[in-house]
Amino acid sequence: MIRSLAGAFAFGTVLPVRASAGVGRGALTALPFVGLALGALAAAVVWAGGWAFAAGSPLPGVLAVAVLLLATRGLHIDGFCDTVDGLGCYGPPERALAVMRDGSAGPFGVAAVVVVIAVQALTFAELSVLAVVTAVVAGRVAVVAACRRSVPAAAGSTLGAAVAGSQPRWVVAGWIVALAALAVFACPRPWQGPLAVLVAIGCSLALVAHCVRRFGGITGDVLGAAVEVTTTLAALGLAIG
């Protein structure tokens, strides 16, 4: 378990954690714990910003998103950008994967990144501390779900090959149940939180399924997209009302 946590934090954060092995099944299973730590960090920034800035200011949310980007090396948002560019191009899967590996950001990807960062920043500023934690954890639970059994890796993807199909269904179900239980306390209405995170996870699963059809399987970029889309939609759902 300690090795799995070390691998998860080495993969999902900038912390100089030594991992005895690369990213694999154990590290992916433990990834929601990384989300819990990152969510607590973002929530602390929002809480402190609430004291520092005027009521209703979006700056606490902006700073929280900035801290998350720094703490994750921008890994997930970069993957989201590449995935959007890949989905936005024409041609066979090989062409889409080549676009994703190119390293440069296209206009479609840049526009999508701006929207996602803006929505996260604005919603985080409106959420309770626990709701911020819940949204960030939801993004990491989505990665576990994306790597469930039967999901293939795209051709040539090193990370995809290491983690695709690695998560048993009971692990996926367990994390989703735990996330829904946490979300009960994230909003004044006890049903809103679970509904918000379940819808967000469902949308992420639909995105991953589309990527599997388009690319022939998942890649590390697709997992980054799952993180960002789920976090954004969960935060949006938790902020309603």
Swiss-Prot record:
As for membrane topology, the entry says: Multi-pass membrane protein
Named from the GO MF annotations, one term is: adenosylcobinamide-GDP ribazoletransferase activity
- Work out whether the entry's keyword set contains Nucleotide-binding: no
> Which reaction is recorded as catalysed by this protein?
alpha-ribazole + adenosylcob(III)inamide-GDP = adenosylcob(III)alamin + GMP + H(+); alpha-ribazole 5'-phosphate + adenosylcob(III)inamide-GDP = adenosylcob(III)alamin 5'-phosphate + GMP + H(+)
Query: Which Gene Ontology terms of cellular component type are present?
Result: plasma membrane
**Required cofactor names:** Mg(2+)
Name the NCBIfam families for this protein: PRK00235.2-1
The protein's matches in PANTHER family, at most eight in alphabetical order, are given as: ADENOSYLCOBINAMIDE-GDP RIBAZOLETRANSFERASE
Q: What is the role of this chain?
A: Joins adenosylcobinamide-GDP and alpha-ribazole to generate adenosylcobalamin (Ado-cobalamin). Also synthesizes adenosylcobalamin 5'-phosphate from adenosylcobinamide-GDP and alpha-ribazole 5'-phosphate.
Q: What is this protein called?
A: Adenosylcobinamide-GDP ribazoletransferase
Which source organism? Mycolicibacterium smegmatis (strain ATCC 700084 / mc(2)155)
Lineage, opening ranks: Bacteria, Bacillati, Actinomycetota, Actinomycetes, Mycobacteriales
Q: Which gene encodes it?
A: cobS
